């Protein structure tokens, strides 16, 4: 069962990646054939096999020999993992849409409302109505301060604010806080690495969306266990 979930996840993630890349160029992503980004040759089914195609072709285009960007297998591996940890169709769709949000924001510095609407729809089906107040609080516990900061300092984009409001709704306030802390940690580490490697300057904008998505997925999948672990360590005085 895990194998099939991983396979489905990698296939969907491969499509999501193509959708995001072609959306940026305003190209058709539903019916047009996939082609090598360098030579333009139409790819066959073996070339497009998620993960395996990259391994079989040794990371190079079969026709021109140019290297295939690592983004393709990394997205497919991520999709396989997201498929494996999904417990329902709604969760898988939600995870894949979050992946689309992360990729699109990375490429365009924008979070599309249409992607957020899908996450909201799927997230609603995961809410336990017995804890509705918890979920409603989660939708504002981070997003409201972010909104105020966005208006006062322009430190956040409105897409980031909307993403945290939607994520907080299905996470609840505890996991929402955890997800935001994880986002801050991972974002800070990546920013420091980019600065040290001179890949970015102090004035360069770095998209928050991918880190918000990472924190959201971790908090959703492992949040309660991480919170319980933290509480156990705190009571032990560690």
Residue ranges of predicted features:
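Hydrophobic alpha-helical transmembrane segments
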Residues: 1-11, 82-87, 126-131, 215-238
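Long, charge-rich boundary regions
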Residues: 58, 62-122
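Functional transmembrane core segments of multi-pass inner-membrane proteins
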Residues: 93-192, 196, 229-237
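Membrane-proximal soluble regions of multi-pass membrane proteins
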Residues: 16-71, 208
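Interfacial loop-to-transmembrane junctions
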Residues: 193-218
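Membrane-water interface at transmembrane helix exits
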Residues: 17-21, 25, 87, 150-154, ...
């Amino acid at each position: 069962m895990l194998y099939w979930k991983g396979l489905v996840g990698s296939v969907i993630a491969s499509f999501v990646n193509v959708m995001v890349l072609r959306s940026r160029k305003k190209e058709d992503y539903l019916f047009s054939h996939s082609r090598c980004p360098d030579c333009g040759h139409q790819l066959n089914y073996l070339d497009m096999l998620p993960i395996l195609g990259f391994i079989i072709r040794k990371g190079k285009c079969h026709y021109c020999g140019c290297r295939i960007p690592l983004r393709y297998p990394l997205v497919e591996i991520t999709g396989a993992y997201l498929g494996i940890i999904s417990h329902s169709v709604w969760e898988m769709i939600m995870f894949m849409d979050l992946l689309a949000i992360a990729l699109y924001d990375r490429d365009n510095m924008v979070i599309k409302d249409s992607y957020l609407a899908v996450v909201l729809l799927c997230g609603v089906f995961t809410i336990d109505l017995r804890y509705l107040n918890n979920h409603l609080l989660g939708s504002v516990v981070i997003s409201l301060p972010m909104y105020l900061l966005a208006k006062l300092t322009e430190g956040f984009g409105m897409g980031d604010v909307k993403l945290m409001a939607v994520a907080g709704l299905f996470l609840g306030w505890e996991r929402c806080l955890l997800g935001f802390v994880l986002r801050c940690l991972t974002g800070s580490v990546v920013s420091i690495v980019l600065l040290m490697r001179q890949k970015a300057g102090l004035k360069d904008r770095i998209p928050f969306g991918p880190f918000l998505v990472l924190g959201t997925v971790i908090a959703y999948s492992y949040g309660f266990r991480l919170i319980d672990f933290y509480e156990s360590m705190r009571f032990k005085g560690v």
